Swiss-Prot record:
Protein name, UniProt field: Translation initiation factor IF-2
NCBIfam families, per the entry: IF-2 (TIGR00487), small_GTP (TIGR00231)
Organism from which the protein derives: Burkholderia cenocepacia (strain ATCC BAA-245 / DSM 16553 / LMG 16656 / NCTC 13227 / J2315 / CF5610) (Burkholderia cepacia (strain J2315))
Biased composition (Basic and acidic residues): 49-63, 121-181, 209-260
Keyword Signal belongs to the record: no
Region G4, annotated ranges: 580-583
Amino acid sequence: MASNNVAQFAAELKMPAGVLLEQLQAAGVQKASEDDALSEADKARLLDHLRKSHGATDGDKRKITLTRKHTSEIKQSDATGKARTIQVEVRKKRTFVKRDDVSEGAEQGQAQVAEADDDAELKRREEEARREAELLEKQAQELRERQERLEREEAERRAREEAAEAERRRAEEEAAAKRAAAEAAAAQQAAAQQAAAEQETAPTQSAQDEARAAAERAAQREAAKKAEDAAREAADKARAEQEEISKRRAAAEAEARAIREMMNTPRKAVVKAAEPPKPAEPAKPAEAKGTLHKPAKPEGAQARPAVKKPAGAAAPATTQAPAGAGDRNKKPGAGKGGWQDDASKRRGIKTRGDSSGGVDRGWRGGPKGRGRHQDSASSFQAPTEPIVREVHVPETVSVADLAHKMSIKASEVIKVMMKMGQMVTINQVLDQETAMIIVEELGHRAVAAKLDDPEALLVEGETGTDAEQLPRPPVVTVMGHVDHGKTSLLDHIRRAKVAAGEAGGITQHIGAYHVDTPRGVITFLDTPGHEAFTAMRARGAKATDIVVLVVAADDGVMPQTKEAIAHAKAGGVPIVVAINKIDKPEANPDRVKQELVAEGVVPEEYGGDSPFVPVSAKTGAGIDDLLENVLLQAEVLELKAPVEAPAKGIVIEAKLDKGKGPVATILVQSGTLNRGDIVLAGTAYGRVRAMLDENGKPTKEAGPSIPVEIQGLSEVPGAGEEVIVLPDERKAREIALFRQGKFRDVKLAKQQAAKLESMLEQMGEGEVQNLPLIIKADVQGSQEALVQSLLKLSTDEVRVQIVHSAVGGISENDVNLATASKAVIIGFNTRADAQARKLAEANGIDIRYYNIIYDAVDEVKAAMSGMLAPEKREVITGMVEVRQVFKVPKVGTVAGCMVTDGIVKRSSSVRVLRNNVVIFTGELESLKRFKDDVKEVKQGFECGMSVKNFNDIIEGDQFEVFEVTEVARTL
């Protein structure tokens, strides 16, 4: 901001405006007020005045000193012969004096001062140059000695090689001559023998002799040809060796020539850099002026490139020298501390990028400089695109395997995981989702894959079955809210009394029945209506063809009714609405219809597609109409399934029977299940040893849409698992074991992925109470529903921890686990055996038995409420007014008080109020009436009180007396 007046200039200088006005007036600038304008001339006059007042003779600088520092390196051998790099620092200092028109005496004095400074500087520079020249001379002498030694060793080695080569050639020539002479003698001898033989046997064997003579002549020609080939091969070998020796000699000469060039160039460069500047130049006015205006270009600035240029020119000579035999046969210590190391050992300024021009790209591969490499090739590297791989990610994969699939190091994967907040090792197992995120983070394409999956054979087997499709009975699931009469409706249809036998009058198991009607067979699935059995209802909707939605006419649409509608719509299943309990006086079917329309279920009479049938499970009214509508919907759906084919189905319910072992209720969806078939259900497999219908009677086969109970599985299957018949038990075992391993790996991987988050949550939550439980139920569905219901009770302060949950009776193993984990055992429709009961009594383990899910949930909720920290509340018991204050030695301040309201107890806490503002909160130290200690003082009485650790009491203060009470909390 340009300052236009005195006030702005004072603000810019951060000084009072009055002081600035005084300084301006002292400088001869007449300014009367802060609003007066200031010009640049006024500011210049003020500056001159201030300089003179501070002792400066003139406003201009008379002298300027420039300091420059230059660092170079030289090689110096120590006593051990090892070359060391020595830093040589040259400091230069120049003083420039401004000359003007002053008296001659002043000029001479200034010239003498400048000359004295220049003489001292010149002497110091000459001394430094002399020392540097000595060091360089010593270095050059060492280089010459080393070069002479290298040349001498090279000449000796070359002479030895030439002598050995000549000796070897002479030996080879003698051997070749001997071989040729021997072969010629052998040929002559063979010819003589042949001639003698011919003369002896000519009269009798003329034909045989001619053939033998031809063979011998061919052998002689072959021998002569071999001798010629051997001689030619020996000559070629000798010529190649001679060429190799010539190449080595040329390489050695080139290296020696490069060394000689190097010896000559640095000397000149360093000596030139060390030349002191001429002392007469700074005295010239024109040059002094130029130096003052352009301080970045002193005279020595041109000397620096002269130092660097020869060194840079020597570097290409290094890289262009051919790497021949001279480099390979050179002794390891021969080049130690030589000129090749200058560029790589020289320290440079730290910059971004490569500023060395390729000199520092050498690498050292062994001790004492062996394996040294210079980048003799071009420094250009062609740009390459990153390779994007398609990585098939299985459901579980270790960090090492994932890195191998992407062709990178495992440490790169670990880095990415650490950035994501997870600490892993190379053997850590990752789930598929996490692994795919990592693959995409590293720039590759992730593909979910199931490699080496034996279940693929099941899909291939399914496509190969082309059995005839025949009509099958419909599977109808009865759904609705609890106590709306679903089971009673089924009892009337089946002529049974199942509802009377249910504990508490509510259904807690999913049941499967088939009913023969005059128009065909219908299979019913009865689902529980309690909110805890959501998973059961979802399984029922998954396996069904038609949903019968039971709604009580006196109760209307309830939460589980809405949930059943959502399950049916999600499965795309048609809905038949049965409005039950129409025999009650308070029944209102029209209200039920309106509520169902609001939920998206529109009756046929309103233009929808859902038939509404009013029924009464008690009187049987409307039952036939309901069955008629169900069968009508089934005809519209045209339900068909193959009969003469291996069976497929779904597990409706599963349990562990003490005498029968694992028992599963399955619904056959297609094919025919026979006794003795090999079945696979999730991770369980086995041969069907026994098969019972819903009435408990043995049966040999079950067709489509028929529910049966099977025995013979290896373990209790999960409810909702798909059941399939396989021809081979070995294949069933293989698939079951594969599923077990996959389930275990996926579970461990997900636990590991959530471990860090749970740790951080626990750290943030602090102390959390845990209620460990062990749950044993009669069937899988009930166990699943009970676990989910109890886990929903967890809060931020008390958490339900399910240590173990399974199907079957309570055993000794369960009691031992409860002892180790300090858990409570809950038995739902199960009991503990005698050994388990004795062990539980001995260890003090609490075992609770329930047959209604409400009771189990309510009691666990009450136990969790007891574990909650009690809530603390303050109750004000009285008010006290201070009338007089006494100072008692060794005791402190005692207040004489009047109890104006309530009662004051000795054990109470107190707040000190002054003008209705709390100034202290603490405890009563003493409570006296007259001179006696009392426990309490009632309203209207005087007393003496002292507060612990508080003595600042004055008359008129008020004491608010209160007590802290603990109140039990509930969930």
